[in-house]
UniProtKB/Swiss-Prot annotation:
Its EC number is 3.4.24.-. Residues 547-602, 825-883, 884-945, 947-1001, 1003-1058 form the TSP type-1 domain. Zn(2+) binds at residues 392, 396, 402. This is A disintegrin and metalloproteinase with thrombospondin motifs 10. Coiled coil: none annotated. Residues 213-233 are annotated as: Disordered. GO terms for biological process: extracellular matrix organization; proteolysis. Residues 1-25 form the signal peptide. The gene is ADAMTS10. It comes from Homo sapiens. SUPFAM superfamilies: Metalloproteases ('zincins'), catalytic domain, TSP-1 type 1 repeat.
Amino acid sequence: MAPACQILRWALALGLGLMFEVTHAFRSQDEFLSSLESYEIAFPTRVDHNGALLAFSPPPPRRQRRGTGATAESRLFYKVASPSTHFLLNLTRSSRLLAGHVSVEYWTREGLAWQRAARPHCLYAGHLQGQASTSHVAISTCGGLHGLIVADEEEYLIEPLHGGPKGSRSPEESGPHVVYKRSSLRHPHLDTACGVRDEKPWKGRPWWLRTLKPPPARPLGNETERGQPGLKRSVSRERYVETLVVADKMMVAYHGRRDVEQYVLAIMNIVAKLFQDSSLGSTVNILVTRLILLTEDQPTLEITHHAGKSLDSFCKWQKSIVNHSGHGNAIPENGVANHDTAVLITRYDICIYKNKPCGTLGLAPVGGMCERERSCSVNEDIGLATAFTIAHEIGHTFGMNHDGVGNSCGARGQDPAKLMAAHITMKTNPFVWSSCSRDYITSFLDSGLGLCLNNRPPRQDFVYPTVAPGQAYDADEQCRFQHGVKSRQCKYGEVCSELWCLSKSNRCITNSIPAAEGTLCQTHTIDKGWCYKRVCVPFGSRPEGVDGAWGPWTPWGDCSRTCGGGVSSSSRHCDSPRPTIGGKYCLGERRRHRSCNTDDCPPGSQDFREVQCSEFDSIPFRGKFYKWKTYRGGGVKACSLTCLAEGFNFYTERAAAVVDGTPCRPDTVDICVSGECKHVGCDRVLGSDLREDKCRVCGGDGSACETIEGVFSPASPGAGYEDVVWIPKGSVHIFIQDLNLSLSHLALKGDQESLLLEGLPGTPQPHRLPLAGTTFQLRQGPDQVQSLEALGPINASLIVMVLARTELPALRYRFNAPIARDSLPPYSWHYAPWTKCSAQCAGGSQVQAVECRNQLDSSAVAPHYCSAHSKLPKRQRACNTEPCPPDWVVGNWSLCSRSCDAGVRSRSVVCQRRVSAAEEKALDDSACPQPRPPVLEACHGPTCPPEWAALDWSECTPSCGPGLRHRVVLCKSADHRATLPPAHCSPAAKPPATMRCNLRRCPPARWVAGEWGECSAQCGVGQRQRSVRCTSHTGQASHECTEALRPPTTQQCEAKCDSPTPGDGPEECKDVNKVAYCPLVLKFQFCSRAYFRQMCCKTCHGH
């Protein structure tokens, strides 16, 4: 099996001759183009968000850097059309590529010559319009368009055509460009493979190969790293790789000072986008903090065809310039000049083992990230595809091996080889990471090797506008943009995923481009919506890319040990939902641990580290078999498995991490978890605060032992060994100090074994000396005073003896001796194990109760046996504080809409995440992975009884004044289909059949006068009469008329007399005798009336 070599011999089919140049394989762009199987010419045009040409307005008169062709806008749209392709690029400025205040440095042989601020304005990343989730674009707009377009499972590369026509163009036109597929590239080194073989001897290999590490022992899934000291392990957090980029003098000469800066940044722009892909399983930001362009050779930097020697020289050189540039030119200490990794881009055709050109493209140490002299790489410039080389090599510094080398990726039926493939073929997808790469970087960060990536450097931020182009241009107008002025929309189905338009030949066609965002749409669940990211959503809403959310915790795994304190683990994955459309990867704890099987192992059990070392006895090491035992010398990591070959004078690290639950050191109860030393309480529980007292009793009160200390002065110097003190069995915290600067000889005598220390100054420091069931450590302080210390307890009594040369005090001693069992109280308080966490997530609690135990057998007894005054306080701690995964929260069902027969009831259904015990956060429905529970359901009650049914009311009778309305009331069945006898319905519930009414007031009664009768006089004045009666509005007789308004019933009349006969005199004028009211007639001036004038002729005469 080939080791996970860091040499990248990617197939040169990645794209030769991109950007401003052609590679060493071709002398000109014409020669390069002739090598392609096919290519096309396109004229990229800057357009608006819907593909329409921009209105041209002349720029203001100002000086502009020649040839950039760039814009300062944060968002751009370009249309790239060729005979077989049609792309509408949606580009957004890459704000995360450059750290704040980054500068470009030009170095001569003497060091830094001059520097200026970097110009990030022409670096863009994005996607094809309407295809945010299925396409990728990384483009530099300086000097034309240079970059990659990934769409429809094909990679396209674009670069300006050299020597194109230079006629006048509008600012939106970019001139002729070459567009070709990566699959059309051909190169003689296509089958070049990794040049490292198994049979090469380990000794003598270059240092970057000696550091190779095996793949993770088991798939780590979605585990992430531990953080800096004090931070939790297995917690996913954002990482920031501050990157130094160096272009050698051949790069500067080839591309020219005018263009090399933007060319290099265009490459790094693609690198940054590759590390942003969610397939990496971690959030890693590539930031350029320093860009150095070498215009001359450097005195201490040797770059040649030999990749190994060039890498060695570059790694040392980049370390030397961290705080200085050139010969002592200081870089301001603002944090920007520091870097986590260094990238060299060279125009040399490099080769791994010889100083001649060959197919090697890159070289980097595996697992070198955050190590100052190993976090570096050399990369051959092959055009824009250099970005894949750099991303590949940085992957190696994260501990990634090649896909298929020491792992299953790339094998048949397994995850295909991807960005970390040893060489790229036409079937390889270099834009995503394989599951093996994800496991490698997770293991690397999980082991605490990425601490330097936790700090967040300053960066340049930009505000991006948000638009809804479909609101400005409806679907018909979008069709006219694509197919001419007579086109219009012709299919109205899933317009958000595919816009269908009438062609010039009046056929309904589509180019598979979705309608613009904001275009009106409708589905069976949305009456009025608009298109957003190829989906019809409620009008006005803008659902962004879905951020990842943690799924549920897996069940606790098996315990790592059967006794002595093991570890059980549980993990969760960022898949509820998975991050999509650029959504963020989950941050937070992804693996948790708990203690298990904490009881002591049986007496005589083999040391757990010894067991692990002995498992390698049957595995050959460099072709031979050895018996391995634990090595605990200086410089050994506490949680790595370092074993000594018994009988041989060498040791080696057999495993990067011991089995979980292994003690970190012999004199501590702390244990190793995932390669990191974790604190445990003396009860062997992770995270427990329970501590030993001075007697080494867990949770004790110090009453089980007494401290014995003193200073010994010899009685007869030189007379032989003298007894100093007797240390009883079970003593702990033993301390013996030599006060005579080793002018004494010390001995420890036991029942079965002894320890003699002579010539202490010559003993290697520190030294570990096993005796009486414990380990004594020989230490030497800064004042040269030596001491012998042991944690204990000792399993046999010891006598301290000394052979002194002077009468001066020779030894100081101190230890804690056990008190006789008879004098110990028989019962004492102890902490019980922690209870199970009260909640699975969002913050639960655990309680550690206190119980009274028998000191002799540790059995629990009734509380009254222990002293109430010494009772320990009950403990409580938080647990499972991480937020719960999104889930549906369902309310109670409402009452049925009907109390009998069939009805409907409803309830509230909300997608939310419980953040803590007192806080819940409502989320969009798409965040919940499970189907939404129903909001409505049918409900049924008892059969409804018959009921009264009333028909409509009749009109009010009479039409004015008080009246009545009438209606028909029937007894009906519950479904109103059958009419039943009235006895079937409740009489008390019967609605009324009549109702009083009063539409309006009736007209008042009025006087009605008849016709006048004939005059009573046949000649002269007389009277006539008529009838006057009071009638209602119905014509009936009434007594309600106003008397004052009653019309008269008589009237004076005058009949015409015949002519008088001769001799007849005039008739005498007199009052009628029967009338006595003539004076009143005169008084009230009624004489003008004919009647009164006739009746009172005399009285009225003359008036």
